[in-house]
Amino acid sequence: MFGKGGMGNLMKQAQQMQERMQKLQEEIANMEVTGESGAGLVKVTITGSHSVRRVDIDESLMEDDKEMLEDLIAAAFNDAARRVEETQKEKMASVTGGMQLPPGMKMPF
């Protein structure tokens, strides 16, 4: 079924892929991504594991209404989270050779 050494090679390839994926998970968890809203007036920087590192608010917004500022912060965070997801997909595709995860299945972090 697997031919000469086929099963051994298959197991070795699976182990190598698992090691690459573990390294990738660590790399993604430590990366920082910045999302923006209000044409860059609000910036939120998060890690690959979605921990907020920084929130930068342009001084000009400090006198505007509170509700608008809250909306801009939420939008900037959502933009950063979307960017993390895109980066995860791109990096995962490079490890899996473009093989996609089943719908609804996410990386374990």
Curated annotation (Swiss-Prot):
Entry annotated with the keyword DNA-binding: yes
UniProt KW Cytoplasm keyword: yes
Function: Binds to DNA and alters its conformation. May be involved in regulation of gene expression, nucleoid organization and DNA protection.
Family: Belongs to the YbaB/EbfC family.
UniProtKB keywords: Cytoplasm, DNA-binding
GO CC annotations, alphabetized: bacterial nucleoid; cytosol
Localization of this protein: Cytoplasm, Nucleoid
GO terms assigned for molecular function: DNA binding
Region feature (Disordered): 1-22, 88-109
This protein's name: Nucleoid-associated protein VP2178
Entries under PANTHER family matching the protein: NUCLEOID-ASSOCIATED PROTEIN YBAB
Signal sequence range: none
Subunit structure comment from the entry: Homodimer.
One Pfam family named in its UniProt record: YbaB_DNA_bd
Source domain of life: Bacteria
